[in-house]
């Protein structure tokens, strides 16, 4: 199942890159997201997910609604610690959803979730979130696959403006 996070103002990526503040500000936009309640699979590398088109987006349709199924943006680095920890840039989708409602991202305990972002200090690393708290940011290499690192997709609603008031 997925939780509807509503409309958020955040950036997403379309290819592997380090996300700069400038890029995030120029590319953030309002979009409606659902976020998976769990990691739908684990023990799969970022590279393996990317090979299947699942990091930056795959078209998906259900109930007459068109979506892009993909990983969320999570930040290329982090700032703060504990409950004040955030991915940087802070206009990433993961933190933007949590800023709206801390309950939107569930079942993070002892499970990391892959994000889209390349880590700013090492291009071989990819950002992951979760495990010790919903806000926790960490990283691992794009080729690693571990049982505690999973794929928690988001569904981006593509035609929300044509759905009408009862569409979602």
Where are the model-predicted features located?
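Short, surface-exposed beta-edge/turn micro-motifs
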Residues: 30-32, 149
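Surface-exposed charge patches in extracellular/virion surface proteins
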Residues: 8-12, 28, 58, 100, ...
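"Short basic amphipathic alpha-helical interaction patches in structured regions
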Residues: 47-54
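C-terminal, surface-exposed recognition/capping segments
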Residues: 2, 20-23, 38-42, 54, ...
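Short N-terminal edge-element motif at the start of the domain
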Residues: 1-30
């Amino acid at each position: 199942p997925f939780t509807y996070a509503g409309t958020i103002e955040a950036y997403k990526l379309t290819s592997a890159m380090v996300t700069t503040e400038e890029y995030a500000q120029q590319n953030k936009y309002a979009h409606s997201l659902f976020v998976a309640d769990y990691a739908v699979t684990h023990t799969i590398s970022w590279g393996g997910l990317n090979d299947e088109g699942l990091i930056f987006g795959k078209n998906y349709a259900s109930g007459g609604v068109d979506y892009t199924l993909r990983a969320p943006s999570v930040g290329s680095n982090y700032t703060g610690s504990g409950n004040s920890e955030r991915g940087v840039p802070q206009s990433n989708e993961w933190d933007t959803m949590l800023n709206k409602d801390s309950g939107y991202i569930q079942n993070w305990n002892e499970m990391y979730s892959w994000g889209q972002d390349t880590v700013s200090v090492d291009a071989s690393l990819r950002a992951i979130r979760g495990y010790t708290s919903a806000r926790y940011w960490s990283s691992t290499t794009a080729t690693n696959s571990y049982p505690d690192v999973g794929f928690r997709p988001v569904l981006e609603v593509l035609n929300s403006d044509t759905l009408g008031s009862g569409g979602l």
